Amino acid sequence: MRTATAFTGVRPARRRATKRTKITKNSRLATVGRSQTPVLRAATPADAHAIHALITAHIREGHLLPRSLEDIEAHATRFIVAIDRDRLVACADLAALSPLVAEVRSLVVDESARSKGLGQQIVNELARRARVAGFDSLCAFTHSAGYFVRMGFSIVPHPWIPEKIEADCRACPLFRQCGQYAVTLPLAHGVESFVPLASLHG
């Protein structure tokens, strides 16, 4: 496992620093905006119902696949979530397709929290975690390819991600008529902070 370090003196600067959300070994937290909300953190099983509700509420937009509550409960710790005033407003799942390829799944930002960069911050954190876990690439299947391209992903033919096809696509009724783009991001392995990642491979 690659390890390394994680991501004075006037009093005002020191006082502001103490108000920031603490970064712990179990989850890297981030804040957005001067009010320090929303906050990004690793999800826990206690978040499963809120994650399920957020995904279900946005399925009608046509960009998400349904996820059962049982599935989310089983994989809750793979999610990164954004919390705004005690309300879960964004999430995404980091799923292992193979020992070398991970996938961004169920990326959704509630309409009330959009245009704040939350989606990009969540994807960046998932990419960081995938890199630490030893994956060589991060992929996604999406209707919004341009969104991912702006984050450094490349559009590729679906067969270039055979792990996804074997894991999910062949069982999909739209397999031969898929309207999604396949995008992929190579992960350069560098110095990263340690985060617990056992759940990604189990």
Give the role of each language-model region:
Residues 110, 188:
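Residue-level recognition of the GNAT/N-acetyltransferase active site
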Residues 109, 115-130, 140:
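Conserved acetyl-CoA-binding loop-helix of GNAT-fold acetyltransferases
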Residues 25-66, 83, 180-182, 189-202:
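Short amphipathic alpha-helix that is part of the acyltransferase structural core
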Residues 6-9, 18-25, 31:
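Short, low-complexity, charge-dense intrinsically disordered segments
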